[in-house]
A protein has these predicted regions:
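Alpha/beta enzyme core
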Residues: 90, 102-192
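N-terminal capping/small domains of soluble enzymes
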Residues: 1-95, 101
Length: 192
C-alpha cells in the first residue's frame, strides 16, 4: 500500500513523524524506534548559539497530565550540523529541523547555515519570546508573524513550516498571516 504524502514539494514515504522537542534527533531512541520506518524526524529546536534551558525541575506530573518547562535546551547550530545531521543521514527518513531564536536575526543565522545542509524542510518555532517586542512571542501578533515569516522565506532555500503558538485568541488569524507571508506549511501547536 502506498502511504506516501507530499507537503510543499517534499515527498514522505508515510505521514508518521515525530513532534519537535519530544524526540531530540532520535539518538536516544534507537533501541525503541526504527527511524527508517518514520516518514520524518522533526528535530528538537536549534538556535544560533547553545541554550542551557531552564533549571531543574523541568517536568512535573500533575493530576490529568504533565507540566513541562524545558526552555529549548539545545547545543546550537554548529554542533547540531556536525553531530545531529550526520546521524540522521544514516536513516531512510526525511529531516525537518526545528529552528528557534530570540530575534529575527537569530532565526536568519540558523536558516542560512541550514540552507546547505541535508535538512529537507525547516519548522520555524514562533512560540519563542521576541526580545525586541517586549518578550511577546513572534507567533502572538499577526504583524510580527508576517514579518518573521517573510524574512525567513526570503532567506530559506528549503520549504518552511511555521509552527504556531497556542497562546493566541484566534489562531486562524496567525495561520493566515503566515500563509500571506509565504509559509509553505503550518504546524499546530507548541506546548500548552
Amino acid at each position: 500500500m502506498n502511504t506516501s504524502v507530499t507537503i510543499a514539494g517534499v515527498t514522505f514515504k508515510n505521514p508518521v513523524m515525530t513532534a519537535s522537542g519530544t524526540f531530540g534527533s532520535g539518538m536516544e531512541y534507537g533501541d525503541f524506534v526504527d527511524l527508517n520506518r518514520l516518514g520524518a524526524v522533526v528535530t528538537k529546536g536549534v538556535a544560533n548559539v547553545p541554550w542551557p534551558g531552564n533549571p531543574t525541575p523541568r517536568v512535573a506530573e500533575v493530576y490529568g497530565g504533565m507540566l513541562n518547562a524545558i526552555g529549548l535546551q539545545n547545543p546550537g547550530i554548529d554542533v547540531f550540523l556536525k553531530r545531529d545531521i550526520p546521524f540522521l543521514q544514516h536513516y531512510d527518513t526525511k529531516i525537518i529541523v526545528n529552528v528557534c531564536g530570540k530575534t529575527v536575526e537569530d532565526y536568519l543565522e540558523v536558516v542560512e547555515k541550514l540552507n546547505d545542509s541535508a535538512a529537507d524542510m525547516l519548522e520555524i518555532n514562533v512560540s519563542c519570546p521576541n526580545v525586541k517586542e517586549g518578550a511577546i512571542a513572534f507567533g502572538q501578533k499577526a504583524d510580527c508573524l508576517f514579518d518573521i515569516t517573510s524574512k525567513i522565506k526570503n532567506e530559506a532555500r528549503k520549504p518552511i513550516i511555521m509552527k504556531l503558538s497556542p497562546n493566541v485568541t484566534d489562531i486562524t488569524e496567525m495561520a493566515k498571516a503566515a500563509e500571506a507571508a509565504g509559509a509553505d506549511a503550518i504546524s499546530l501547536i507548541n506546548t500548552i
